[in-house]
Structures are given as C-alpha cells and as structure tokens.
Amino acid sequence: MKNHKLPYRIDRLPVIYPFHRRANNHISVGDLVYYGPCPEFYGIGEVLNVVEHLCIVDFRGTGSLSIHKDALELKYLIPIHKLNLSHLLMEV
C-alpha cells in the first residue's frame, strides 16, 4: 500500500465503534459521513442512497484505501454535521 498524504485531517476524527450510543444516527441522502471504527481507511464520503439498514456512500478515494463507492451498515457511519466535526478537518 502506498503511503500518500490525505487531503484532510482525517486522523483527527474520533473513532466511534458501532456498539457505542453515538453510533445511532439518522443519516439521509447528501450527508457527509465517515467510517467510525477507522476513519483513515475510507475517508469522508457523501451518502448516495439509504436502503433499510444499508447506506451507499461515495468516498471518492479520500481515505488511505482509495475506496470510491461502498455499501455499509448505518451503525458504522458517523455524520460530520451531527458531531460538528468540520473544524477538525481543516489543514493547520
């Protein structure tokens, strides 16, 4: 795996596991989300579709694994706006 610099400070996002109460979120189409258990893997993505307990997210290759689209369970996704985390993502 190549070691490239990520465009955002994804390493500063809090790790939130699926069994934690903060993992119970209402997510809708268009929300910016990240993968709670390991934010660096997927990066930040936009929700494209929500079907029952699954969510289709376009990560646009922003994480260290360069994943573009994936389907994940809602309990693994944390919305950026809910925790007001946008200030953590800016370059210093």
For each predicted feature, which ranges?
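Short, surface-exposed secondary-structure edge patches
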Residues: P18-H26, P39
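Intrinsically disordered, low-complexity, charged/polar segments
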Residues: K2-F19, G61-V92
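A general structural-boundary detector
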Residues: Y17-H20, L32-Y34
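Basic/aromatic-rich interaction segments and small domains that mediate binding to polyanionic partners
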Residues: K2-P7, V29-L32, P37-L72
